């Protein structure tokens, strides 16, 4: 599909008019103009107990959009743990089919249809699961191939299920991304990381008052400063091995200069202005599972076409992406 037509594809599958109206009017604004992210609707965990999702090879399809940091981290973990052969993937177009509707489309696939699920839009899967669903259809969305229904869109915990419940399918010598002796500390760290940085950039970008925007931006850069200091003392956030925390930090950092800096006005500093953070981000990017799942083109398109007024769909030329492949030296440093 040509780039110019990405925002104007026709909706080949007619959705319930009331649902479309809800999507158009969906608001995640709180008191004082603050952005309040909608809760996840499908949060059933994986496990052996009654009512929990069964761990089963080739039963689930992971729907993602390369632009979304929450979905990206699930794809990174899937790759690092070697789950590619047991969990299939469906990929959504980086540009929404209708700027006024918070939906995602399978327009990268032949005939604009996911080849396995046979749907045009992510919202079709959400409505098939819950006909009364009125929120935004979001990614990652894990779909049960037996029922063609969304069984989990809990981005905050999905990676941890892959790390702890899918171990029998992990590849030989898979990294321990969520070491049991550090889980409590990692969870506490990740909670604050999400509030101040991961979701913090969205709090800034979708703020509706100056005060809400200012508060969000200040918190974003306080957290970046904290990470900069922490990374002076270790190669990764929790020592010399990649953990769940690094993946969660990476998906925001890799989008920072190319998207958030301009689109969400988090522009006090660039990632490149931080010595440790910039080398750390390059270190992760140059690791298999990170660079091969990072789509800069998709990220740039989504945030500059769908998230800000841009009627002519003009994309910035920069930043220079070749710098992501420059030497980082974090593997050669001595840390104290």
For the regions a language model picked out, list residue spans one by one:
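C-terminal alpha-helical interaction module
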Residues: 1-336
């Amino acid at each position: 599909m040509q780039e110019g037509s990405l925002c104007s594809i026709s909706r080949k599958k007619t959705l319930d008019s009331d649902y479309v109206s809800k999507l158009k009017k969906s608001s995640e604004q709180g008191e004082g103009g603050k952005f309040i992210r909608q809760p996840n609707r499908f949060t059933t965990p994986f496990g052996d107990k009654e009512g929990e999702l069964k761990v089963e090879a080739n039963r689930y399809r992971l729907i993602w959009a390369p632009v979304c940091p929450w979905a990206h981290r699930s794809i990174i973990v899937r790759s690092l743990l070697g789950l590619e052969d047991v969990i299939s993937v469906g990929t959504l177009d980086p540009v929404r089919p209708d700027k006024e509707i918070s939906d995602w489309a399978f327009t990268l696939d032949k005939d604009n249809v996911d080849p396995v699920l046979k749907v045009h839009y992510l919202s079709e899967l959400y409505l098939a699961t819950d006909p009364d669903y009125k929120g935004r259809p979001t990614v990652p969305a894990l779909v049960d191939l037996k029922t063609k229904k969304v069984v989990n869109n809990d981005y905050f915990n999905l990676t941890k299920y892959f790390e702890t419940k899918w171990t029998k399918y992990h590849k030989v010598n898979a990294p321990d991304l969520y070491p049991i002796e550090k889980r409590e500390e990692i969870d506490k760290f990740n909670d604050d990381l999400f509030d101040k940085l991961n979701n913090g950039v969205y709090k800034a970008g979708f703020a509706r008052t100056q005060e809400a925007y200012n508060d969000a931006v200040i918190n974003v850069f306080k957290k970046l400063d904290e990470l900069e200091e922490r990374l002076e003392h270790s190669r990764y956030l929790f020592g010399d091995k990649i953990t769940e925390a690094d993946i969660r930090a990476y998906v925001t950092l890799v989008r920072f200069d190319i998207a958030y800096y301009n689109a969400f006005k988090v522009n006090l500093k660039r990632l490149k202005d931080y010595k440790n953070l910039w080398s750390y981000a390059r270190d992760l990017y140059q690791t298999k599972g990170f660079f091969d799942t990072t789509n800069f083109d998709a990220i740039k398109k989504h945030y500059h076409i769908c998230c800000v007024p841009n009627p002519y769909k003009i994309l910035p030329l920069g930043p220079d992406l070749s710098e992501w492949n420059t030497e980082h030296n974090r593997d050669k440093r001595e840390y104290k």
